[in-house]
Amino acid sequence: MIDLRSDTVTRPSRAMLEAMMAAPVGDDVYGDDPTVNALQDYAAELSGKEAAIFLPTGTQANLVALLSHCERGEEYIVGQAAHNYLFEAGGAAVLGSIQPQPIDAAADGTLPLDKVAMKIKPDDIHFARTKLLSLENTHNGKVLPREYLKDAWEFTRERNLALHVDGARIFNAVVAYGSELKELTQYCDSFTICLSKGLGTPVGSLLVGNRDYIKRAIRWRKMTGGGMRQSGILAAAGMYALKNNVARLQEDHDNAAWMAEQLREAGADVMRQDTNMLFVRVGEENAAALGEYMKARNVLINASPIVRLVTHLDVSREQLAEVAAHWRAFLAR
């Protein structure tokens, strides 16, 4: 089965599984798991931050990030289509009494700082206190411009706001920039990394920031049910991924660009391609039929009027050629 629904469908390689089986473990709630500690230290080192915390999921990592920045009755400014606003079940509001203030992102995925400024609340008892600006990099595959990251950082310093980056796919941005992680993360107070998307682990995310912030995050992780015991088995997969699966993300980007060109040549309406994602307009009338057609040929896609295809380490160029051939045949019916 060729699965292009998301890079979350990746499976651990044999080498990763061997690293997991060989991992020394301890009780991480006590802080005694050496593999978890090594992963957290390595993430902090890569990013130039002081500390990191390993969590089961990206949704929990984002929730803990917001809870550790904001008190009840405070708010964060966020994009309308941001994952930690739209796709995480309203956790910040429901569990943290943190008010989201969404704004529309620009075409390049940035939140225009003039619009952000207009949403910062005055010091008035009628309003929630604005505490945090939350960005996403990459955002729907788009890499935020480097200069914007610097501008957003300086903007938040001037306005006494914290800056968090949902970096679920931040290493896709790192590869696209051709930079080191710390070149991006110097411009934020905290950020997350999802290890189970393009990096290929079965589970796990990291939240990274300064020591005091991560100390608060450890308490919130425990409160929200994320304290794990011998989790070094999972952390070993994360360590393997960070040391072996980052540079290869360029292959996913190249495959996505190649696939976009193949589909264009086949007559498909390819809207855009960024990093490891491409978006193809198929229309309401063709969405279900295309999904069924592809599934019958052992290809899984999200059947919707605009299809998002995501390349990853478990999909080869040869398999993408098969998908392109099926797409061409579907259009020629």
From Swiss-Prot:
<dbReference type="InterPro" id="IPR001597">
    <property type="entry name" value="ArAA_b-elim_lyase/Thr_aldolase"/>
</dbReference>
<keyword id="KW-0663">Pyridoxal phosphate</keyword>
<dbReference type="InterPro" id="IPR015424">
    <property type="entry name" value="PyrdxlP-dep_Trfase"/>
</dbReference>
<dbReference type="InterPro" id="IPR015421">
    <property type="entry name" value="PyrdxlP-dep_Trfase_major"/>
</dbReference>
<feature type="modified residue" description="N6-(pyridoxal phosphate)lysine">
    <location>
        <position position="197"/>
    </location>
</feature>
<comment type="subunit">
    <text>Homotetramer.</text>
</comment>
<dbReference type="InterPro" id="IPR015422">
    <property type="entry name" value="PyrdxlP-dep_Trfase_small"/>
</dbReference>
<dbReference type="GO" id="GO:0006545">
    <property type="term" value="P:glycine biosynthetic process"/>
</dbReference>
<dbReference type="GO" id="GO:0005829">
    <property type="term" value="C:cytosol"/>
</dbReference>
<comment type="similarity">
    <text>Belongs to the threonine aldolase family.</text>
</comment>
<keyword id="KW-0456">Lyase</keyword>
<dbReference type="GO" id="GO:0006567">
    <property type="term" value="P:threonine catabolic process"/>
</dbReference>
<dbReference type="InterPro" id="IPR023603">
    <property type="entry name" value="Low_specificity_L-TA-like"/>
</dbReference>
<protein>
    <recommendedName>
        <fullName>Low specificity L-threonine aldolase</fullName>
        <ecNumber>4.1.2.48</ecNumber>
    </recommendedName>
</protein>
<comment type="function">
    <text>Catalyzes the cleavage of L-allo-threonine and L-threonine to glycine and acetaldehyde. L-threo-phenylserine and L-erythro-phenylserine are also good substrates.</text>
</comment>
<dbReference type="Pfam" id="PF01212">
    <property type="entry name" value="Beta_elim_lyase"/>
</dbReference>
<dbReference type="GO" id="GO:0008732">
    <property type="term" value="F:L-allo-threonine aldolase activity"/>
</dbReference>
